[in-house]
Amino acid sequence: MPTVQLVLVRHAEAADGSLFGDDSQRELTQRGQREAAFLCRTRRMMSVPTPDVVFTSGYERAEQTLERALEGLSLRIVRDINFSPEGSYRKAWEMILDESRRPLKEEDRLKCIWVVGHNPNIERLLSLVSPEVSAVLRPFRKASLAWLKLRDVESHH
């Protein structure tokens, strides 16, 4: 199995849930918008690779974070309930594994997969793929990014 770069991002600060009847519709606060814009600057400054695919929940706060963090890029986005707060991180991981197996058109570079999602599942995914990094980054705060290079993706179960 080839090496894959995995970037895990927790959405930026969102409006209080009591203001919305539907949790999936919560939007970023002004602070959250600044945090997501900072993620974009950080991505560029650190040369975090452009994703081949982005997995996300489709929840408004994750979508807004994704749009600002990856501003100006043409992206393949997969929206799935397993990347939501109520989703199954194990099923989400299987989707990531399936994507990691898909061949790239340019064989001379590493595949890069981004996940823009929610806790507790972002923390669970991080713990699954790198318990050491997870221990350092716990709690995985809003508008945080973890950039991992996974040499043997299949071994992370």
Residue positions per predicted region:
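Short phosphate-binding loop-to-helix
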Residues: 84-100
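Long, internal stretches of domain cores in catalytic or enzyme-like folds
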Residues: 75-80, 93, 105-106
